[in-house]
């Protein structure tokens, strides 16, 4: 029923941008959940007593535990950023009101092809958070899709975008498992995301998959909170 209602409510924006409709995204998320459950059930059913008899985990048990751990991590990340959404949004609002708005646009655009047409240049902003990149790029006339795993962040992004929100396609997705077709975007941009990811390499593979041949991938990040587990950095901090 949810998928049918979503299908009725969805517009053609997704199709025009080679992006799954609301219902298709919900269906994809459902399939991913079912697949994970199937893996865990199959793994449990296939596990033998041989490993247990020797105090050794079977391969299927390892797969099951890894999948459970990943889902727990995603939930923890979503909870963390849900709590921080409003405060982080205020930081982005300050950036939008200052020189960073222009400085970041210049930084991004210097990497884009000179012969581009902004109106047809398709950009994916992964881990958009409160929407800083998606806002300044939409303001410059680009076709922007903004992705974040945390619903609260997407709500802040829409509020911060104001009138630009109608031009941005917002999607709630896991950055490591994107529901987009291969070679969809001319550029993929991200800021302050990869330090959150358990497996950045998997995320990079996905980002490259949805990037057109010859496209641009721009990732800006740092070792945030490195001082918490690195003695040398702790002294500097």
Residue ranges and their predicted role:
Residues 1-21, 50:
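Low-complexity/repetitive intrinsically disordered segments
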Residues 2, 19, 39-40, 56:
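Short, positively charged and aromatic/hydrophobic N-terminal segments
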Residues 65-118, 132-136, 156, 216-237:
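Conserved class I S-adenosyl-L-methionine
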Residues 124-126, 130-177:
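Class I SAM-dependent methyltransferase SAM/SAH-binding core
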Residues 176-187:
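A short acidic, Gly/Pro-enriched loop at the edge of an enzyme's catalytic core
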Residues 187-199:
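A short SAM/SAH-binding and catalytic strip from SAM-dependent methyltransferases
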Residues 201-213:
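A short glycine-rich, Lys/Arg-flanked "PGG" loop and its adjoining helix->strand segment in the class I
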């Amino acid at each position: 029923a949810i998928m049918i209602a979503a299908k009725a409510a969805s517009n053609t924006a997704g199709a025009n941008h080679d992006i799954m409709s609301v219902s298709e995204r919900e269906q994809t998320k459902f399939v991913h959940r079912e697949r994970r459950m199937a893996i865990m059930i199959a793994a449990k059913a296939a596990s033998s007593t041989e490993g247990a008899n020797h105090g050794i985990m079977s391969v299927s048990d390892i797969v099951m535990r890894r999948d459970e751990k990943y889902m727990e991590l995603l939930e923890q990340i979503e909870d963390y950023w849900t709590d921080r959404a409003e405060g982080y949004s205020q930081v982005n609002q300050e950036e939008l009101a200052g020189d960073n708005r222009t400085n970041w646009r210049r930084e991004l655009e210097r990497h884009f092809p000179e012969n581009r047409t902004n109106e047809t240049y398709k950009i994916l902003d992964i881990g958009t958070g409160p929407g800083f990149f998606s806002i300044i790029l939409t303001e410059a006339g680009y076709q922007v899709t903004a992705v974040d795993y945390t619903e609260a962040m997407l709500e802040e992004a829409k509020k911060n975008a104001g009138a630009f929100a109608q031009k941005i396609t917002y999607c709630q997705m896991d950055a490591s498992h994107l529901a987009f077709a291969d070679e969809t975007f001319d550029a993929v941009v991200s800021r302050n995301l990869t330090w959150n990811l358990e497996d950045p390499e998997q995320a990079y593979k996905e980002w490259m998959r949805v990037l057109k041949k010859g496209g641009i991938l721009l990732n800006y990040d740092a070792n945030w909170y490195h001082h918490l587990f690195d003695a040398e950095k702790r002294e500097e901090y």
